[in-house]
Amino acid sequence: MAENKITGKVHFLQCLKQTIAYLTYLNRRIKHDRLTIAAGSMAYVTLLSLVPMITVVLAALSAFPVFAGLGELLQNFVIENFVPAAGEVVKTYLNEFVANAGKMTAVGIGALFVVAMMLMSSIDHALNYIWRVHEKRRPVISFSIYWMVLTLGPILVGSSIAVSSYLGSLNLLNSEAVNGLFQQTLRALPVIMSSSAFLGLYLLVPNLKVKFSHALLGALVASSLFELSKKGFALYISNFPSYQVIYGALAVIPILFVWVYLCWCIVLLGAEITASLGERKQWQLSSGEPITSKDCDVKVMAKNEQEKSSEAENNKGTK
């Protein structure tokens, strides 16, 4: 009984020591990578690339007749679930910008595509820097990955929304039990999509093999923080409308920038968590030698105690 208690305490201390070592290493890593500065840079690039990205996405959807009319549905879904405040204003401005972009010539549309590619390249560079990857992919491979994300990404999202809408129209969903389950699934869809997006980002973008369990944990942490920040940010904007008071009709600009900056902080934090989980040896050594299995052996501990007591008795006898 006493041995079990000692074993439990040792394991608890071991887990506590490992957790403290990991959090210390993670904090040091975040400071070294200047996460907040990198997030600000990515937010700036994102705002510059936002309209070109949406234009390319809508163009990819319109190229397939089966997805006709899904562009606006997808845009509404993204704004309602991923932009917590000033969603209608953002939607109005984006529609105007995209409509103006649609009037451009082929050269202008090509320039928009290049700008959208620059955003993908910035994401690639930021995440590979976090993973300490110095070897770059060949340009052909990078272009293929960016093209796949820009084309297949919206198609897959549009397909999921189309399937959800189709299932919602079936007579099979008339029963209360099935309908309730379907409604719960729809409510969880933004969380599932954000988790899947983070997981794919942490698995595919770094130019090295990332453990699925590490990427999954980082994605779950990032998606949880994303949902909490979405609700918290919306609550702050609605209860403390300082931006509207100061900027008036232009308040949507700083609101959108702050939100995009916060999103990139979460994305990069999830990447730091995922990358640091794969550096176990480094964060173990950063806090000294880890507790080994020998330290957890109760018999060894008891033997050490006996040796100490016998040495104390021998010293007394010598005196």
Curated annotation (Swiss-Prot):
Pfam families: Virul_fac_BrkB. The keyword Cell inner membrane applies. The chain crosses the membrane at residues 50-70, 107-127, 143-163, 188-208, 215-235, 249-269. GO terms for cellular component: plasma membrane. Disulfide bonds: none annotated. It comes from the Bacteria. The keyword Transmembrane helix applies. It is found in: Cell inner membrane. Its main location: membrane. Keywords: Cell inner membrane, Cell membrane, Membrane, Transmembrane, Transmembrane helix. It is a multi-pass membrane protein. Belongs to the UPF0761 family. This is UPF0761 membrane protein PBPRA3489. It comes from Photobacterium profundum (strain SS9).
